Amino acid sequence: GFPRSGTTLLDTILRSHPMIDVIEEKSSVKKLVNSLSNLSNKSFEKIKVINEENIKEIRTTYFEDLFSYINQEDKQKIYIDKLPLNIVYIGEILRIFPHAKFIISLRHPCDCVLSCFMQNFKLNNSMSNFLNLKDTAVTYDLIMSLLKIYKIKFNFNFFEIKYEKLISNFNDEIKNLLDFLDLPWDNSVLEYHKTADKRDRIFTPSYDQVIKPLYSKS
């Protein structure tokens, strides 16, 4: 999704489920993309002809990097790699993981853009696009336009969840999402605020919001 679209709330809800763990805001996908870029001489077209041996190697390296962030892998769990702007790499991800499932968090564009602009993000290459309102709006439009292209070009497996629907119809939205993940309902997701309390720290700008009751203003 896009920053400030409810991704941290969704992260906390999902990690409350006993069969889910969320690996938050790591660079594993970016490293995957860099590996693909090097092999294809930075040509998106050449990505299509990368051989199976290279794909297996990148896949293995990705998992090694991703699981380095957890204490012990539980093969019974589903692990979600959560970084909102990974949405721009859907094409590359599908080249390595053609059966990947994507959860796309959405929110009304005006709320999303204004919230990003007003947020005091830690500055990096991505967050530098939010230093003024115009650039923030342009960035949002570019990324959502890219998502539309991906939907047209690729027949990939995704689930969209809208922040506004989540807070107004929590149970149904989360049940549908769990169905998408082939997981049963578990009442622990209703107590996501307890999960937030137990976490050492939530490393996103929303850390003080997910422990509160659901609300539409953020």
Named regions from a protein language model:
Residues L39, S43-Q76, V113-E160, S168-S218:
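PAPS-dependent sulfotransferases, especially Golgi type II membrane carbohydrate sulfotransferases
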Residues E92-M118, L177:
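Conserved phosphate-donor/acceptor-positioning beta-strand/loop module used by diverse small-molecule
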Residues G1-F2, D81, K165, Y192-A196:
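Glycine-rich loop motifs involved in handling phospho/adenylate chemistry
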